[in-house]
């Protein structure tokens, strides 16, 4: 079994179902079974312990259920205590290693991010965060050994991770907005529209925004549908959500990718806040509490953004090589060297904050944006004012 061909940087990716001409299935049940057992071997070596707890979740892809069954079987055959979280976001799966209600040793997310419906993949987490490229190579080596001995004491329990994760986000909003009149409903009077792209992000409407008093009318594509019938599940596909914000006269729009590790925003005028603008907005939020911090971005950011960061926000801007893990790892490295870096972000919408485990979490970024929008709303201002001095290039072309 050639598992190496399934590695895509720090992820596993492959064709999971037939349906696209010329694309045969590569991410088989046998492959994910072996990868699951390889992950167990990786964790046992790292933590030097036999008894492990591992959480598993998935996005809305049509192949998720079948793959999950094979992965769970691999974990159970290794004697693992499995926590089946069902529909989840990629960042919430890491948080299953953090939350007191879970305290997992590791987590597996079944997702292929924004790729077409016939693709799927796996992301792996331990208590330190997402596994990197070299970790995946080690995991694959373990998985290819195929000399596994089945154990008898594995088990499976089902738990609602998204509800715990949503409560975490709600408490953050209540605390940071600190509404003087309606503390428990800090988003009262605000109209916030969400486009979940038929991925896993619909929970943000009914589990986060609505309980806090937000009017979410006009929100679209909230139902999980792994065929992605409305638009590609990518926060860079902005036209539909921009139109919806204008039509519904919303104060703010939020769009997620399939597994909610990326997000972008729309201001009240229907203007997209994506690519260079989402970097600028995230930096503006961070620099209020951390003046002069270093913002690490991918290399394709514009000169206009660089000027905004350094000469308007007065933070340091470091362009680094592309790839969200590269950008995050560089920010982590800077902090270890004593250089404060609070934000690592790609123009694609991958944003990781130091205050949040350097986890690239689209819902956490959206939450920070919602908090600031709510505070500005109380003061009679709007979010677009934060980046009004950002100039845009006359033409953007990626080579």
Which residues does each PLM region occupy?
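An N-terminal, well-structured beta->alpha segment
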Residues: 1-71, 77-78, 154-189
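N-terminal small/polar loop signature for handling phosphorylated ligands or for N-terminal nucleophile
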Residues: 41, 53-119, 170, 207-266
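Short glycine-rich phosphate-binding loop at a beta-alpha junction
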Residues: 49-59, 83, 191-193, 293-299, ...
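Active-site nucleophile and cofactor-binding loops and adjacent substrate-binding regions
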Residues: 82-91, 272-275, 297, 319-322
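Glycine-rich phosphate-binding loop
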Residues: 105-117, 245-267, 272, 318-319, ...
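Gly/Ser/Thr-enriched, mixed-charge loops and adjacent short helices
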Residues: 118-245
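Phosphate-binding and adjacent anionic-ligand microenvironments
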Residues: 290-399
């Amino acid at each position: 079994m050639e598992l190496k061909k399934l590695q895509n940087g720090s992820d596993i990716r492959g064709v999971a179902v037939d349906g696209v001409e010329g694309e045969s299935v590569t991410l088989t049940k046998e492959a994910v079974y072996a990868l699951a057992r390889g992950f167990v071997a990786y964790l046992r070596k790292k933590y030097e312990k036999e008894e492990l707890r591992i959480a598993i979740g998935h996005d809305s892809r049509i192949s998720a259920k079948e793959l999950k069954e094979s992965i769970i079987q691999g974990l159970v055959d290794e004697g693992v205590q499995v926590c089946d979280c069902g529909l989840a976001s990629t960042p919430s799966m890491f948080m299953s290693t953090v939350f007191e209600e879970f305290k997992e040793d590791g987590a597996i997310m079944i997702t292929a991010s924004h790729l077409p419906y016939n693709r799927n993949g796996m992301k792996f987490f331990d208590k330190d965060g997402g596994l990197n490229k070299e970790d995946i190579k080690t995991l694959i080596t373990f998985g290819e050994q195929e000399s596994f001995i089945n154990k008898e004491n594995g088990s499976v329990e089902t738990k609602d991770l998204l509800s715990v994760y949503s409560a975490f986000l709600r408490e953050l909003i209540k605390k940071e907005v600190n509404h003087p009149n309606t503390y428990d409903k800090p988003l009262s009077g605000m109209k916030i529209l969400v486009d979940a792209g038929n991925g896993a992000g619909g929970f943000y409407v009914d589990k986060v925004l609505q309980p806090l008093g937000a009017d979410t009318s006009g929100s679209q594509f909230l139902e999980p549908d792994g065929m992605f019938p409305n638009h590609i599940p990518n926060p860079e596909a902005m036209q539909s959500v921009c139109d919806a914000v204008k039509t519904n006269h919303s104060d703010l729009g939020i769009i997620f990718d399939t597994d909610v590790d990326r997000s972008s925003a729309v201001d009240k005028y229907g203007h997209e806040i994506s690519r260079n603008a989402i970097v600028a907005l995230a930096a503006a939020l961070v620099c209020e509490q951390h003046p002069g911090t270093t913002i690490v971005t991918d290399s394709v950011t514009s000169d206009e953004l660089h000027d905004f960061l350094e000469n308007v926000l007065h933070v340091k801007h470091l362009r680094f090589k592309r790839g969200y893990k590269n950008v995050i790892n560089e920010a982590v490295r800077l902090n270890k060297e004593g250089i404060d870096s609070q934000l690592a972000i790609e123009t694609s919408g991958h944003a990781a904050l130091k205050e949040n485990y350097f986890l690239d979490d689209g819902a956490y970024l959206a939450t920070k944006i919602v908090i600031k929008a709510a505070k500005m709303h109380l003061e009679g201002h709007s979010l677009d004012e934060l980046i009004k001095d950002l100039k845009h290039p006359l033409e953007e072309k990626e080579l």
